[in-house]
Amino acid sequence: MLLTPAKTTRTEDSANSTDDSSKSSNSFMRAIVSSLMVKPITSLTNTVTCRQSSHHNSSPSKITRYDLIKAAAENDLKRSKSQGREKSRRNSNRRNNEEIFVANTASEIQRTKSSI
């Protein structure tokens, strides 16, 4: 008779230990799942708020959608400015050519203006 209660207590102890280990493994799994669930959501949305923009300046190693849009806008602005300068240079070349024609006789000036 003494053997049976001892066996039952051992099985209860082993059952308790398996319950404890399953509880700890469950809590460990919950911690892993919660950390995995939180991080990808913020990286997928890429929404920039006021708080994130201050953090954004402190960590230049991360490139976000905001960085790409801002760089594209800056490149477009630079390109439009450089094209504007090229056009003004072309116009100034035309003006210089007209000045050269002005130095010629009046009949040649009339011919060049009519051809334009």
From Swiss-Prot:
Residues 1-26, 74-116 are annotated as: Disordered. Residues 14-26 have a biased composition (Low complexity). Residues 74-86 have a biased composition (Basic and acidic residues). Residues 104-116 have a biased composition (Polar residues). This is Uncharacterized protein YGR035C. It comes from Saccharomyces cerevisiae (strain ATCC 204508 / S288c) (Baker's yeast).
